[in-house]
Amino acid sequence: MRNIQIALTKGRLEKHVIPLFEQIGIDCSELKNKGRKLVFQSKNTNVSFILVKAVDVATYVEHGVADIGIVGKDILMENEKDIYEMLDLGVGICKFCVASIPTYNPKSYRKKRIATKYPHITSTYFHDKGEDVEIIKIEGSVEIAPLLGLADAIVDIVETGKTLQENGLIVFEEMHSISARMIVNKAALKTKKDEIFSIVNMMEQEILSGK
């Protein structure tokens, strides 16, 4: 069987996804004891893994370096890539929200300034609502923007809401629910069809059995 390379994102999503691969019989012991390594071979299958930044997973898949990728829906929404989205894995679930300080008025007619790491998603959301906003792109912690007067509100991913609460912010609007997705390179789906669909189908059955 041909080797299948899977790109995973480092961090929180990685911890959610490794058990799913183990449950379908793919050894992930090297991933659990990785040290500083970034490339790993499963000991019992033709699967190898690479660990990259979340924003780069879809790029590796699009260019064929990885056959399969696991990435948050937020990355796919913000960065349009020429890939196939195969499965909603139902893990890493959170929401895009509009949040701000308690005095924020979402119904105000004046042009608002919105700070976010996700300018495309944010501009599309407000455009669809018919609202003209100024988008301020921030790479770091966006929660501070309303506190310092840089922005009227923020758009960010919210899981528990604890970070917002600790910074005195509240959620005003829930925009989109997001979760981890399995994506596939278009060319690989033709050249490695059997191997890829074997993983996709087993993963789908595992997800359905867990519901």
UniProtKB/Swiss-Prot annotation:
CDD domains: PBP2_HisGs (cd13595). SUPFAM superfamilies: Periplasmic binding protein-like II. Signal peptide: none annotated. PROSITE patterns: ATP_P_PHORIBOSYLTR. It is found in: Cytoplasm. GO terms for cellular component: cytoplasm. The keyword Cytoplasm applies. Pathway: Amino-acid biosynthesis; L-histidine biosynthesis; L-histidine from 5-phospho-alpha-D-ribose 1-diphosphate: step 1/9. Its main location: cytoplasm. Its EC number is 2.4.2.17. The keyword Cytoplasm applies. InterPro entries: ATP_PRibTrfase_cat, ATP_PRibTrfase_CS, ATP_PRibTrfase_HisG, ATP_PRibTrfase_HisG_short. Keywords: Amino-acid biosynthesis, ATP-binding, Cytoplasm, Glycosyltransferase, Histidine biosynthesis, Nucleotide-binding, Transferase. One of its GO terms (biological process) is L-histidine biosynthetic process. It catalyses: 1-(5-phospho-beta-D-ribosyl)-ATP + diphosphate = 5-phospho-alpha-D-ribose 1-diphosphate + ATP. It is an enzyme of class 2 (transferase). Catalyzes the condensation of ATP and 5-phosphoribose 1-diphosphate to form N'-(5'-phosphoribosyl)-ATP (PR-ATP). Has a crucial role in the pathway because the rate of histidine biosynthesis seems to be controlled primarily by regulation of HisG enzymatic activity. Heteromultimer composed of HisG and HisZ subunits. This is ATP phosphoribosyltransferase.
